[in-house]
């Protein structure tokens, strides 16, 4: 009888010390970033010995993409994932992975990540945030409702922008930028608010972009932008050292898995676009040279 009481007391103490983190995710549950985050959350929860539970909230259900960074920083959400280059105003380094044609392969993207990571982590720490991991999207391509054969075809094209780099690209190519979050892409194309964008084959597939009159995907391999997962430092400091170490280990595994998933999506999602009836291919050499010159101008 005394043993039963003792076990109950120990269990109640453990439960009292247990932490619950709500993880804000901007993208739908079927997106590989969200699926990877869900697996990370599950693994952390299982390996914490009851000390930490992470509950994921995909599809902007807890906070929308543009709200997640601030929500985690202020502690409204303990953990969240955010598209890094949308945060250029917070720290210009967060936008380095969206510098056009600076990194046009996964190898170069990893080199760029390794070169910038330490300073990014330091900058986030100063803002009360702990960096866990980052995963790239597949190579960014150009989507369009109409065929693009020359620089003139870009003039006045209503273009979806999501950070300062894409706004600048629009300005340098004569396109008309409109700021649209990923969750609003389908609506923006269906209403005619935009008619072109630069984003990954994954985003196009997940939003079924072909249902909104988008017929062309041009694989220009413009850049490999990343999502990062961050934790509120106050929430982090409530964990004991062993739990923190375990979370970091799982974060490293999630990062490795995420890069693999991204590489798979780079091939498979372009095939999905083609299977849905879209024209998938490259732009002509003169147009590719024009885009690369834009990248040099922005460097």
Feature locations, PLM:
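N-terminal secretory/targeting leader peptides
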Residues: 18-110, 116-299
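Short, basic/polar N-terminal leader/transit segment immediately after the initiator methionine
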Residues: 1-3, 20-21
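Bacterial N-terminal signal peptides
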Residues: 3-12
